């Protein structure tokens, strides 16, 4: 393990206004998360996105071209010293609220970030851990999408059930609907009309 200040392993850059850009494929991130997509990007390499204003605990990661607004810094990381994904997870577990420099809205300055000390293993270990965590994150995202699809499917099935239940209540007007004959001790299936 070796101790570094963040200033030794990365450069912090300011986000910019995106309002003059058109809709497109590149995500725009703010301190609250994904905002929209635009037709241009600020940076194309993997980057840890650090909140400047707002929710200081919402450290994000971008691994494809992106744009950030002025409430979010992006980082240019020295890949010889730090694996971006490993560094993302390392910083994510820190409590940054103690470094808050704002009086009203929580805020962080370049210097607040640059003075953070991190203990990093050698780059090969970082890459192995970073890759493992990346695979886990991908699996978690896949599971979330599966759960969302299951919820949507359940809601659709529930709607269909409600429609069928309504048809069963009105079986006398639906001659092709099968119903139960409960007039005797044995239950028989009969046509509705």
What are these regions (language model features)?
Residues 30-97, 101-105, 109-113:
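A short beta-sheet element
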Residues 1-30, 115-193:
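Non-catalytic DNA-recognition/assembly elements of restriction-modification systems
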């Amino acid at each position: 393990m070796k101790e570094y200040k963040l200033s030794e392993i990365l450069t912090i850059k300011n986000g910019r206004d995106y309002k003059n850009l058109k809709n497109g494929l590149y995500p725009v991130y703010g301190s609250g998360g994904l905002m929209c997509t635009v037709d241009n990007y600020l940076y194309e390499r993997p980057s840890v996105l650090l909140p400047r204003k707002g929710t200081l605990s919402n450290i994000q990661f971008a691994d494809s071209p992106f744009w950030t607004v002025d409430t979010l810094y992006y980082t240019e990381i020295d890949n010889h010293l730090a694996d971006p994904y490993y560094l993302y997870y390392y910083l994510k577990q820190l409590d940054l609220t103690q470094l808050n420099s704002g009086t009203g809205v929580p805020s962080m300055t370049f210097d607040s970030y640059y003075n953070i000390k991190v203990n990093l293993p050698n780059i090969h270990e970082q890459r192995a851990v970073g890759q493992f965590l990346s695979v886990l994150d991908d699996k978690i995202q896949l599971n979330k999408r599966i759960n969302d699809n299951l919820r949507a499917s359940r809601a659709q099935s529930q709607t269909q059930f409600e429609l069928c239940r309504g048809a069963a209540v009105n079986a006398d007007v639906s001659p092709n609907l099968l119903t139960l004959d409960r007039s005797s001790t044995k239950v028989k299936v009969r046509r509705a009309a």
